[in-house]
Amino acid sequence: MAVLAVAGGLAVAVRAAAPASVAEEPLLSPALLQALIDMGQPGQVIVPPPGRYRGPLRVTKPIILDGQGKVTLDGDGTGSVLWVMTDGATVRNLRIVNSGDEHPEQDAGIQVRGHANVIEDNLIENTLFGFSLEKSDRNIIRRNRYFGQDLEMPRRGDGIKVWYSNDNEISDNEFNNGRDVVFWYASGNKFLRNVERGGRYGLHVMKSSENLAEGNLFYDNMTGISLMYDHGDVIRNNYIVRSTGTVGVCLSLKESSDVVVENNDLMYCASGIAMDVSPYEPGTKNHIRGNRIAYNNVGVSFVNDWKDSIFTGNLFTGNITEVAVYGGGSAMRNTWDGNRWDDYQGFDRAGDGIGDTPHRVYGYAGQVWMDVPNTRFFKGAPLLEVLDFLDRLAPFSEPTLLLEDKRPRLGNDKSFKAGSTLEPKS
């Protein structure tokens, strides 16, 4: 396979020189690099001489552009840095820096407008958007690292935006201090083994279907994963912690149907799972199973009295409130079966790992914050806690049965497993 580089204005075979430090990187001619790319034949490997090149640059043929870790593409604060406008190209081992900051133009490190491209092992720094895919299918975006511009959250760009693009694989990437990772009108995409830190939405999927998010780590985002107006997504084996925004949700489902949420860790958030009119489509169900929902303010919250979600085999532990239903009503129109509850007060005389009596969660007077939004600020206040205690001790009104799990699992059941298999990272 031919390997080409620019030397003295000509395309010749070369051996790459040792990389210079960032401060010493020579500024080389972008016109010569663009000419080299344009001269390339399908399948050729283009290895530019080490150094720094001003963007924007365009890949319009199915070549392999390999910076070998020694090439920087610098947008100099204007526009997008690299455009991939073909099918079947590979872009790897580049450092891409300093895009513009214009949201109407979606200034990005790499813009993709084609199919079946591979974007791998690149470092993207100080760009508004990391990647932007529009009407581009079957691309692979893997092992890249993105560090967004130092801006206030609303002004940041997305680590990756996938718009009207299907069947892409986004795997083993690291997204730092962007705004969102977002899928719009996108189906059949896979988001695998990525790390997302310090953003607004770790993963935001809207008006899409049959996407898979598996094996990802989400830290310190304002919301972990949010599905809105979706159908058929699978959220599996993810580790979502410390969502610190105004809502502070590990996982939210809004008007989303036929969703599978399984074997995730959902911890240290205001709400582990927030359900908002989900499932939405008649005749559909959402399956929430095998998750560890732990150390949240509320384990599962419902915006209203909704139905047709099935909760099985989940571990609820360390949550201040297990389940909350706002605006009145209960969660009884959903199925609760075989979950483990750390405050279950029954026994297991048969020794089969299943409680002898159902686990029931009631709403007492002290939980007025569920019904009256303006009182939520006072949740946990001594007055409400005393009121709740007195109502439990001597009920002066009929408490609301929020849920009933007829087969609660107990701690002596060694076969019970919940949560992800991931090893947390700092």
Label the model's feature ranges:
Residues 2-11:
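Bacterial N-terminal signal peptides
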Residues 38-39, 53-64, 73-117, 129-135, ...:
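Extracellular beta-strand-rich solenoid/capping regions of secreted or surface-exposed proteins
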Residues 20-58:
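Acidic Gly/Asp/Thr-rich repetitive segments characteristic of extracellular carbohydrate-active
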Residues 43-45, 50, 56, 62, ...:
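Detector for repetitive beta-architecture
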Residues 246, 250, 273-281, 287, ...:
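Functionally critical loop-and-helix segments that line ligand-binding/catalytic clefts
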Residues 47, 58, 66, 74, ...:
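Extracellular beta-strand solenoid repeats
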Residues 75-83, 103-111, 126-129, 133, ...:
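Extracellular beta-strand/beta-solenoid scaffold signature
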